[in-house]
Design a protein with these regions (language model features):
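ATP-dependent carboxylate/acyl-activation modules
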Residues: 116, 122, 312-317, 438-442
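Short, basic phosphate-binding NTP loop
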Residues: 1-117, 124-135, 150, 157, ...
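Phosphate-binding loop of NTP-binding sites
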Residues: 95-230, 234-242, 419, 443-446
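Short, structured coil segments at secondary-structure junctions
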Residues: 65, 82-84, 135, 185-186, ...
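Residue-level signal for inorganic ion chemistry
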Residues: 9, 42, 61, 101, ...
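A glycine-rich beta-strand to alpha-helix segment
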Residues: 117, 417-445
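Active-site beta-alpha connecting loops in nucleotide-dependent enzymes
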Residues: 49-52, 56-59, 311-313, 322, ...
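Acidic, Mg2+-coordinating active-site environments of NTP-dependent enzymes
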Residues: 10-13, 75-80, 191-325, 351-352, ...
């Protein structure tokens, strides 16, 4: 937003400009909702939360050198009286003002916007899109967790002038949330990576989950493109005839032909592509096909080496000093991603045992027991030892036929692993965030 002056920022947000910045001051560099991260030149947006009213910190942000603040009228007087030369903008609802500002900046950028959602795989697809597109276009992708009604507008506002493609991850916790994110971002391409049993506790059925994800398709303009998994029955009621659709996966417009080591062969609407990748997991090949389809939708022909940079908690492999390989996939879990993680464990070379440390999968509703038993059965033939963490994960022992240990929490699991792991072992750690299995990885790496 550096090219915008304070008057334009206020007008775009639908806010009142109560105090201007220093004469000749350009627009803000970034927007932030945490005053501690609102540095000099940034716009601090004071949001009212369940426990904290961010507007109370507006004066401190100005004193610290913020370009300006956007607050409720109740905090405007204190902000105007604060030291510093920053702008003060007031709006009845700073959050909706943030949304309006983001949409205005998105339109001014002129970038192609790709929205990515899915029950699993949206983060890796977003990252793969960045790797696919960056050699051909100036591409910006969502930062970690900038995928909510707060994170998406902040990510849009962080995109600098000259951005050609903006790839936005879109998360949801219930119906209506993807529709909101799409209204803010106005995507040119909407990608649904997968549909699966996630947030069942809130939505109740797979059909309801598909409907919530398909809000992205419903929001697309007629000139936009939907990128969808081929043959996904749950999405059939939500297909549109007035929007171009590209499918990926078996029998899709973009499909895998073969993988030989790091070389992947893809058929993209009859065109043969050969890419070099740094992964061999089946679920990542699926995500790669989604990324390739989205790239083709905006006229980019993927080529060369596509390198996925894995983040901690998202399948990152590390060799521990004791000679144990850790697969850190502790960020989150659902039945689809749990199977994918076990597949990754299966293809990881091991001189010793393959150990699966699996925690509760939360928010699965009344069918939680069944889903956990299915994971226990799936682990047969993959894991030599299964360590279940938490009361729900205990159900995995019912169907797992190998050696099994049940522990109550992450700390106990970490202590157990410290005793039993041997050089050459491979250990997978995965569970829902609420179980806190990140602690296990931290202990193993210490």
């Amino acid at each position: 937003m550096r090219a915008w002056d304070a008057q334009r920022v206020a007008a775009a947000a639908g806010a009142s400009l109560l105090r201007g910045p220093a004469a000749g001051e350009r627009g803000p560099v970034y927007a932030a909702v945490d005053s501690r991260s609102a540095g000099p030149g940034d716009l601090f947006v004071g949001l009212r939360g369940d426990r904290v009213d961010g507007g109370r910190f507006a004066a401190a942000a100005l004193t610290a050198g913020a370009w300006g603040v956007l607050v409720e009228p109740a905090h405007a007087s204190a902000a105007v009286a604060a030291t510093g030369a920053g702008a003060v903008l007031a709006a009845d609802n700073p959050l909706t003002a943030l949304w309006r500002l983001a949409t205005a900046w998105r339109r001014d950028l002129g970038a192609t916007v790709i929205g990515v959602t899915g029950s699993t795989g949206k983060t890796s697809t977003k990252d793969l899109l960045g790797a696919v597109l960056s050699p051909a276009r100036r591409t910006v992708t969502s930062r970690a967790n900038f995928n909510t009604e707060i994170g998406v507008p902040l990510q849009i506002l962080a995109a600098p002038q000259g951005t050609e493609v903006l790839v936005l991850e879109m998360a949801m916790r219930g119906a209506g949330q993807i529709a909101l994110l799409a209204r803010i971002a106005e995507p040119d391409v909407g990608v649904i990576v997968s549909i699966g049993p996630v947030h069942l506790e809130q939505l109740g059925s797979l059909e309801a989950i598909a409907s919530a994800k398909a809000e992205l398709v419903a929001a697309l303009a007629p000139s936009a493109t939907a990128v969808l998994p081929a043959g996904e029955r749950l999405l059939e009621p939500h297909l549109r005839t007035d929007v171009k659709t590209l499918t990926f996966g078996p029998d899709g417009d973009v499909r895998l032909v073969a993988q030989h080591g790091e070389s992947v062969e893809i058929d993209a609407q009859g065109e043969h592509l050969t890419l070099t990748v740094n992964f061999d997991e089946a679920h990542l090949r699926h995500d790669l096909l989604a990324a390739v389809a989205a790239a083709i939708a905006i006229g980019v022909r993927p080529a060369g080496k596509i390198e996925l940079v894995r983040a901690p908690g998202r399948g990152l492999r590390r060799l521990l000093p004791r000679g144990v390989t850790l697969i850190d996939d502790a960020y989150n879990a659902n039945p689809m991603s749990m199977r994918a993680a076990l597949d990754a464990l299966a293809v990881t070379p091991a001189q010793g045992r393959r150990v699966a440390v699996l925690g509760d999968m939360l928010e699965l509703g009344p069918e939680a027991g069944r889903y956990h038993r299915e994971i226990g059965a799936y682990a047969n033939g993959i894991a030599d030892l299964l360590v279940s963490v938490g009361p729900l994960a205990a159900a995995m022992a019912v169907t797992f036929r190998g050696e099994h240990q049940l522990v109550a929490d992450a700390a106990t699991a970490a202590a157990l692993l410290d005793e039993i792991l041997s050089p050459g072992d491979v250990v997978l750690v995965k569970g829902s965030n609420g179980v806190g299995l990140k602690l296990i990885c931290e202990k193993l790496l210490a």
